[in-house]
Design a protein with these regions (language model features):
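Non-catalytic terminal/accessory segments
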Residues: 1-341
């Protein structure tokens, strides 16, 4: 079977948005205080900060739950049963059922679906929160410290043994009661410092600080590599514009970390990438020398134009540090990941 995402049409989106606004106003106040995803005046940053507070209080083990293909596996009949408890209007129930039954594609033919929520639709996040509200209530009844952002749920306990016990019982609840599946390969009981939550992790020791998870750092670097790869005909202005757009957006989210030294090091790394990229772009010793002259590099330092060393090594050289200085890149619009956050 080939899965085709339930991508709504313009009219579908308009109607879903209208329905969502009405239902969200009614339902949102009833949702758990531990739920942060896709709710007014709530954010991923608030969820991460709450997780940090639990860890600081001595809950040094986390049950990191990953729900397997959550948006694909939501059972329609169960979901409609939950909606019917909150919505009396039969016409509205019929409309929501129609959105859910968008269908999947098999051998070129669309057949009705019995599982999943319409990904990309305005109504989908609200329906997902409704499904997982049952999980929130169960965790609250058991007295657990937990944080949920959409289908990302972390439960904090004081010991590994308690974590294993909770993992087993909650996984059983999710499977039997919610009719969803826990991805055992991606779920774990571990120290919070070993796991990623909404792109962040935490430092070890008595002073718990928010830091950027290794996978998030690697994704950032991979995107910078893609942007700064020298392509024929791509100007430094174009590269800078794309870099600035990406880096400002990234800083807006990950600037919430409490490890400024990481942001400073990343900014330095971006500049090195740019110096290496420009060195490659200049190609020949003659062009490199001319570029260094134009950048105001002094006579002795210009001699490295004929160096046979690699671009990444030369990116650290004094000549490129002077010619392609931090101030030079700033004048071209390159933002810092740390300054003016």
């Amino acid at each position: 079977m080939h899965y085709a995402p339930h991508v709504p049409t313009v009219l579908d989106r308009f109607i879903q948005q209208a329905v969502m606004q009405v239902l969200q106003k009614r339902w949102n106040p009833t949702f758990s205080q531990h739920s942060y995803g896709f709710r007014p005046q709530r954010s991923a940053h608030q969820a991460v900060a709450q997780a940090q507070r639990y860890i600081a209080q001595g809950y040094g083990w986390v049950i990191d739950l990953d729900l397997e293909k959550f948006f694909d596996r939501v059972n329609h009949d169960k979901l409609m049963g939950q909606i019917a408890k909150r919505v009396e209007d039969k016409r509205l129930l019929k409309l929501i059922r129609a959105f859910l039954n968008a269908g999947v594609m098999e051998n070129g033919l669309v057949s009705p679906s019995v599982e999943g929520t319409p990904q990309g639709g305005p109504l989908s996040p609200l329906l997902s929160n409704l499904v997982l509200d049952e999980l929130d209530r169960e965790l609250e009844c058991r007295g657990h410290r937990f944080v949920r952002y959409a289908d990302d749920c972390n439960i904090y306990v004081r010991s590994e043994r308690a974590g294993q016990r909770v993992m087993e019982s909650i996984s059983r609840f999710i499977t039997q009661k919610l009719k969803l599946k826990v991805n055992e390969a991606k779920s774990a009981v571990a120290r919070p410092q070993e796991r990623k939550f909404l792109g962040f992790s935490f430092t070890a020791g008595p002073d718990i600080r928010r830091t950027i998870a290794p996978k998030s750092l690697e994704r950032f670097k991979q995107r910078i590599r893609e942007i700064t790869r020298t392509a024929k005909g791509v100007s430094i202005k174009t590269i800078m514009e794309e870099l600035a757009l990406y880096m400002r957006g990234w800083r807006g989210y990950f600037g919430f970390c409490e490890t400024p030294e990481v942001l400073v090091a990343l900014t330095r790394w971006v500049r090195l990438r740019l110096r290496a990229a420009l060195w490659r772009q200049w190609k020949t010793p003659r062009r490199r020398r001319a570029a260094l002259v134009a950048l105001g590099v002094s006579g002795e330092l210009r001699n490295m134009a004929g160096s046979g060393r690699g671009p990444w090594h030369l990116a650290r050289s004094k000549a490129l540090s002077v010619g392609l200085s931090n101030a030079y890149f700033k004048s071209l619009g390159l933002p810092s990941l740390f300054d003016a956050r």
